[in-house]
Amino acid sequence: MTAILERRESTSLWARFCEWITSTENRIYIGWFGVIMIPTLLTATSVFIIAFIAAPPVDIDGIREPVSGSLLYGNNIISGAVIPTSNAIGLHFYPIWEAASLDEWLYNGGPYQLIVCHFFIGICCYMGREWELSFRLGMRPWIAVAYSAPVAAATAVFIIYPIGQGSFSDGMPLGISGTFNFMIVFQAEHNILMHPFHMLGVAGVFGGSLFSAMHGSLVTSSLIRETTENESANAGYRFGQEEETYNIVAAHGYFGRLIFQYASFNNSRSLHFFLAAWPVIGIWFTALGLSTMAFNLNGLNFNQSVVDSNGRVLNTWADIINRANLGMEVMHERNAHNFPLDLAAFEAPSINA
């Protein structure tokens, strides 16, 4: 009896590392994008948790009036936030080593910039990792394309908007009430509700929710029962089964009669493309709108557009919105300026006789 021993070629440590990184047999795929994604998202998450709990007040407006955002400084889960980097820093890169001390770095809101920059890199790498895993498995790349919509939205509020406004202090605070404050101030300064791209985004999000609910309920209502009445219909599905799990003809017939025939998809692939494309395209448009408003290309302005024969203004809903915008604008950053920008923009009258 002859035993043949095959000599395994010795592979370098680097080659084995590369094979492990790109292996689709791992419980969680890492990938080359994951090599960057994991440390950046861990850093952003860790600093966010620490700052949300214990960060000292931040001089957000750069006028020596610190604003408290952490739990240990009097906030709760609703009011708490990681306060954006100070207006005194503007758009300057502000890592820890650029500050004279850790206290100064915290006072100027350094953690916000650290979190946002690492988070941005992390979510971009997550998108790349989705593409990378799809590529390794021989799948099409549309999962990463769909994820690009929330990435674009996050990029708009955390990166593009501060760049357009000239300071990271204008970025969205990392908290619940901070998010709402950002939305209110954004409406006051940019009239976002009257921007067509934001309207498309609203249609995308609400429409996507409606279509998702319609699709899920139709499928659930037209399952092909493989079980008795005494057990759940869900128990009749076997993972990887070749048979259809629901009757698309029945679903098509129901919806076609509920609305009209051509309102219902008879092609499952077209249907699922539509379900993905509708909210993604809507959110793309919203991100694009935010990015244009970052540079003060604002929503449509119909203020005082209706006048009578004597030239008197007849107020419309646009004028009511404008008055609300002015009220919100004078209330935010109360001590940083005395008047809203559009009231302070007029040239002062001459006092010379």
From Swiss-Prot:
Chain positions with N-acetylthreonine modification: T2
Cellular component, GO annotation:
chloroplast thylakoid membrane; photosystem II
Q: Where in this protein does the record say Phosphothreonine is found?
A: T2
Where is the protein found, in the record's own terms? Plastid, Chloroplast thylakoid membrane
Top enzyme class, one word, equals oxidoreductase
Enzyme Commission code: 1.10.3.9
What reaction does this catalyse? 2 a plastoquinone + 4 hnu + 2 H2O = 2 a plastoquinol + O2
According to its UniProt entry, the protein's GO biological process terms are: photosynthetic electron transport in photosystem II; response to herbicide
Binding site residues for Fe cation: H215, H272
Provide the residue ranges of the propeptide in this protein. Answer: 345-353
NCBIfam families xrefs: psbA (TIGR01151)
* Protein name per the record: Photosystem II protein D1
Point out the gene that encodes the protein: psbA
